[in-house]
């Protein structure tokens, strides 16, 4: 019994701790958009465009696509057709592409790189039917004219789906891509400098996700096969690498190689004795500057996932630029022999000047420093997460995180500021979240998921996100897939479902506050927002305010958002190639859920964007949290254990029989009689004979005596003479 209780207690402890880790933070609001609420740009509707956001130019976006660069207005996502740039591959290049085994869709010119050289000139690079080319265009008389054309190998990928990045800084293009048709020669390039060819210690099958400049450095974020783990198996780690802007290459034979290339691991993990790692970086934000726990820091937010053959896990981690720079000033990591462990290099073995640093002229560096940095590009210390743990974790078999965009330091009426995170998934969703403890602490995480928005059709991944800040309340989030570009508002504070102060404050949305004068939920763009907390009620940290009359008493939960709507709206002037399989049954659906563990659940039917109530099309399903299910399971186990123990005890008492004394062997009977009062005789050392009513057995022969007929009881029925057996031997 004791062992069983110990086992159940251990099960309870493990279940509660597991539930505490895997319990996803529930969104406060679910939103599914209809046609009237979404601005959409479709581009080429007959073929896949492979849209890629390339540049923001004042109030327009430059988007790379199939044979075209679109210039799209940020106001309404309409195209400035007079500024469109078309660039098709030549017939000879397409024929050569076909001979290499590629399809017609592959053998097009997908624009992947664009950089503004000055106000009237741009640099554009495209895949050009798997033979990359670059061009300089100049704006003359309202039209773009080609100034020059040159090979784009090392600047642009061959495949439009390849994970490549590029940035233009101080008149130089820095690219991270592949330099061959098969994609087996990855490189970080700025002519004429590149990383080492076929050196797994520098780049080992990388997937680049972002490039940015900071001070005198260019930073590259990517994931790759970990060379330091290769003796134990195969694993993918997330990396941040840097090069110096003014690196001129090394002396002599190192003239076309980086002398400042270093890389570190990014550590996004759930802390503990055995941390759980999210090893594969998918996207990063730009550098965000803000106030965190009273300190001004510059952060980068990143999206990380588990491997595709692991559990479906995604996380968002933040890293400070200070920690990244410190990791590059720390010890190097090396493997002395092929079978040795990767260990930190002792400081006495590091030459002077320290390898990897930015110098005035890298061509004057001694050979020992250049050789050292060539073979010791990996740093020993990983870059830790800023808040000591992930800001948001999602464990889901339905989707993984793909992209992130951040609206930095959104001000609230009480003077605080929060970074609002917009996270795209591979299932067409956008999750809006924040760390409500970020203003008060730099080492605490209190995750809040404000909204979960089904922006794209289910199964269509979000390829890019971009926050557009405009005057007034016209700011928006641009969502990009391969085939369409959409723009949505950053908030839904004015929804007619938010009817009172408690519901507005419980959203914990920095964009929204309750207006005590107008008695409605007001957005951040309100002209009176500067009145502050004297007029507006908001509490991002707790999600409740005493001015609202206490804690909310009910939870407003709508039916599950349909994932495969089948009805198709009519009269829509534009249609996506996915539109036939994804048309919402209602124009707009918003579901508000107050996240409170002590509330009484209630339901609310779907409401369209005009505010009219519609009957619910689905039966409302109860919602159970992980804690509730865990408690129910453990309680059932304990109950079953107690009932089983009591039943077994009663059954054993009922079925217990009388003592069995008629044993077949005399020594066993003597042993029992010796222990009884009648058989005990202290004066005699011998056991008294026991009475036996049965006939005596001859112990010598072990047979009973003959019967009345003179025959032994065990003898055969007839006594016949024994005949000799005749044997014949052959």
From Swiss-Prot:
CC per GO annotation: plasma membrane
Signal sequence range: 1-20
Biological process annotations from GO: axon guidance; positive regulation of cell migration; semaphorin-plexin signaling pathway
Predominant location: membrane
Extracellular side: 21-630
Membrane-spanning ranges: 631-651
InterPro entries (alphabetical): Plexin_repeat (IPR002165), PSI (IPR016201), SEM1A_sema_dom (IPR042068), Semap_dom (IPR001627), Semap_dom_sf (IPR036352), Semaphorin (IPR027231), WD40/YVTN_repeat-like_dom_sf (IPR015943)
Pfam families: PSI, Sema
Stretches of the chain found on the membrane's Cytoplasmic side: 652-730
Chain residue ranges for the region called Disordered: 708-730
Domain Sema: 28-490
Residues of this chain annotated as glycosylated in UniProt: 44, 71, 163, 267, 360, 539
Cellular compartments annotated: Membrane
Alphabetized UniProt keyword annotations: Developmental protein, Differentiation, Disulfide bond, Glycoprotein, Membrane, Neurogenesis, Signal, Transmembrane, Transmembrane helix
Disulfide bond sites: 97-107, 125-134, 244-358, 268-317, 493-512, 504-521
SMART domains reported for this sequence: PSI, Sema
Membrane topology: Single-pass type I membrane protein
Tissue specificity of this protein: Dynamically expressed on a subset of axon pathways in the developing CNS and on circumferential bands of epithelial cells in developing limb buds.
Biased composition (Low complexity): 708-720
PROSITE patterns referenced in this protein's UniProt entry, alphabetically: SEMA
Homology family: Belongs to the semaphorin family.
Reported function: Plays a role in growth cones guidance.
Protein name: Semaphorin-1A
Gene source species: Schistocerca americana (American grasshopper)
Organism taxonomic ancestry: Eukaryota, Metazoa, Ecdysozoa, Arthropoda, Hexapoda
